[in-house]
């Protein structure tokens, strides 16, 4: 599916009421769902273990060839001169809380950060001013183009 392969990681382990508890986190493609995965895990669990407190969210995905996605990526490429393509990511973003939204923004892994700056989503997240101004230009143009689309 669009999200790539199924991944499941072991999270925090702790002792609760004399029992070992292991949390798990899975990222799954759009071709399956949390209930199916939980059923398969339960079938594979050995004696003395159980899978409880299962929660899941349906994968959130919008096709890359929709007018809105094309407007965003075309704007990004025109402003930056790049030839970027839309991509999906495992994990949730704020976009899943809206019926037709995507997370959209610049990400430059080769960007030289200011001396005081840290990485994306860190306490000292920073970017050079020229990249912030470029992002602002991208957002303004993309929003104007999105305004023309009939959703």
What are these regions, as identified by a protein language model?
Residues 1-32, 39:
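Midchain, well-structured core segments that form catalytic/ion-binding scaffolds
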Residues 2, 61-78, 105:
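Short, low-order "capping/linker" segments at domain edges
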Residues 9-11, 50, 82-88:
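A short linear hydrophobic-aromatic micro-motif
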Residues 16, 74, 82-149:
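Zn-dependent metallopeptidase/amidohydrolase metal-coordination segment
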Residues 22-24, 58-61:
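A generic structural motif
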Residues 47-55:
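Conserved short beta-strand edge segments in small beta-sheet-based binding/regulatory domains
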């Amino acid at each position: 599916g669009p999200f790539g392969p199924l991944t499941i990681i072991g999270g925090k382990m702790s002792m609760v009421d004399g029992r070992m508890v292991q949390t798990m986190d899975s990222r799954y493609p759009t071709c399956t769902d949390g209930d199916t995965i939980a059923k398969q895990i339960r079938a594979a669990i050995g004696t003395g273990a159980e899978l409880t407190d299962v929660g899941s969210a349906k994968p959130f995905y919008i096709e890359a060839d929709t007018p809105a996605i094309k407007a965003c990526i075309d704007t990004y490429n025109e402003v930056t001169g790049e030839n970027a393509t839309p991509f999906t990511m495992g994990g949730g973003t704020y976009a899943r809380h809206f019926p037709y939204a995507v997370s959209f923004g610049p990400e430059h892994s080769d960007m030289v950060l200011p001396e005081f700056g840290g990485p994306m989503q860190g306490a000292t997240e920073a970017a050079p001013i020229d990249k912030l101004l470029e992002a602002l230009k991208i957002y303004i143009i993309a929003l104007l183009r999105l305004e023309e689309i009939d959703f």
